[in-house]
């Protein structure tokens, strides 16, 4: 389980450390930084997939996402003024778990003639044991082009000339001297994100789908029917039936198949025929998609939901909250929401964000000293 998340130098987040629980609910007003926290988690997952550089380049590079305020921030109530930068531009992301942690420090490229000047560079990476990447707990260390791993006899060199766009998670995941890299990579790659699931008229979830066993929901929901059928065959029929009846009393889920394709249909009281996926309301389809994500046969280490209440009528919120709470019994869940009704129904651990002088902070904290401890390695 993820125990601590640290973000520094990202959009409206100058320095933020939060502890995560089995179910964490992130709330806050519009513009408070909820989306920045969500995107930072996605960037960490991109590190596990080897695409963090391309993801940042795709949105305009480090200049487009770095901390947007003064280098040292602004005291509450004071006027924000520009200052001369004394340190390097840095985007730092880190996560600690019960077993392993991972931290990355990204910076601007050294001035050179290149068509890829928007690409940030990896300055440091650390895989560690414990609550943060302090020296005593570091297991693998990468500084610029050099990388080394802690072995029985001390430090073992892994590389001296790593490319600035190459991560140690990709380059040495199978290295005999650094088995922790494979564990950290596997942890990050297991995370699942669900954001703005499509429910429009041409949404993939409304189309007949290839009938093939599917252990998890695709990002676009294209395998909705297959995920639900897989969950049924893996012992989830009772939970799925309860989820449908909870939201739509007296209704039954059908998964008709023809010519190797299947689709979702809903049999409802008072109707003479089932309604197929193209006929379902946006809210009904959204609920089915989220239910599939929560009940899928594959149980990731982390599920992150960004504003799952979209398109849902308020009457469906208690049923959705029940599905999320049930999922959190087997999988860690982070929910980012601005709906008070959903946040209250979920319970869990609340992290309320607010903006103070343009900077995202956790409501109720007095300052940087009033947050969980995290030591960023120096460059």
Regions from the PLM with identified roles:
Residues 1-14:
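N-terminal pre-Walker A segment at the start of P-loop NTPase domains
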Residues 319-379:
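C-terminal lobe/lid and adjacent interdomain/linker elements of RecA-like ASCE P-loop ATPase modules
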Residues 34:
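Conserved lysine of the Walker
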Residues 26:
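Hydrophobic anchor at the beta1->P-loop junction of P-loop NTPases
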Residues 39-111:
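Conserved P-loop NTP-binding catalytic core
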Residues 92-234, 238:
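Electropositive, glycine-dotted interaction segments
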């Amino acid at each position: 389980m993820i125990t601590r998340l640290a973000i520094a130098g990202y959009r409206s987040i100058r320095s933020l450390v939060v502890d995560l629980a089995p179910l964490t609910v992130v709330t806050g007003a519009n513009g408070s930084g909820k989306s920045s926290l969500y995107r930072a988690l996605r960037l960490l997952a991109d590190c596990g997939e080897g695409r963090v550089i391309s993801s940042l380049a795709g949105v305009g590079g480090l200049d487009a996402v770095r901390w947007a305020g003064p280098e040292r921030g602004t005291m509450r109530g004071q006027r924000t003024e520009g200052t001369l930068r004394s340190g390097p531009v840095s985007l730092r992301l880190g996560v600690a778990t019960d077993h392993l942690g991972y931290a990355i420090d990204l910076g601007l490229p050294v001035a050179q003639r290149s068509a890829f000047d928007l690409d940030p560079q990896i300055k440091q990476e650390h895989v560690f044991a414990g609550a943060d990447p302090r020296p005593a707990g570091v297991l693998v260390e990468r500084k610029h082009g050099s990388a080394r791993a802690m072995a029985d006899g001390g430090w073992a060199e892994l590389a001296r000339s790593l490319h600035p766009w190459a991560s140690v998670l990709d380059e040495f995941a199978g290295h005999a001297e650094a088995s922790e890299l494979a564990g950290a990579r596997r942890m990050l790659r297991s995370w699942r994100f669900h954001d703005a699931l499509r429910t429009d008229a041409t949404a993939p979830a409304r189309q007949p789908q290839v009938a093939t066993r599917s252990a998890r929901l695709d990002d676009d929901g294209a395998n909705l029917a297959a995920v639900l059928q897989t969950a049924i065959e893996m012992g989830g029929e009772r939970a799925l039936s309860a989820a449908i009846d909870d939201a739509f009393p007296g209704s039954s889920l059908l998964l008709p198949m023809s010519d190797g394709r299947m689709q979702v249909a809903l049999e409802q009281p008072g109707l003479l025929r089932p309604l197929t996926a193209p006929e379902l309301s946006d809210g009904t389809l959204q609920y089915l998609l989220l239910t599939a994500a929560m009940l899928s046969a594959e149980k990731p280490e982390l599920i992150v939901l960004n504003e799952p209440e979209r398109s849902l009528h308020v009457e469906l919120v208690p049923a959705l909250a029940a599905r999320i709470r049930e999922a959190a019994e087997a999988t860690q869940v982070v929910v980012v929401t601005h709906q008070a009704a959903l946040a209250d129904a979920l319970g869990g651990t609340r992290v309320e964000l607010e903006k103070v002088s343009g900077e995202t902070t956790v409501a109720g904290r007095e300052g940087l000293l009033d947050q969980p401890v995290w030591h960023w390695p120096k460059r």
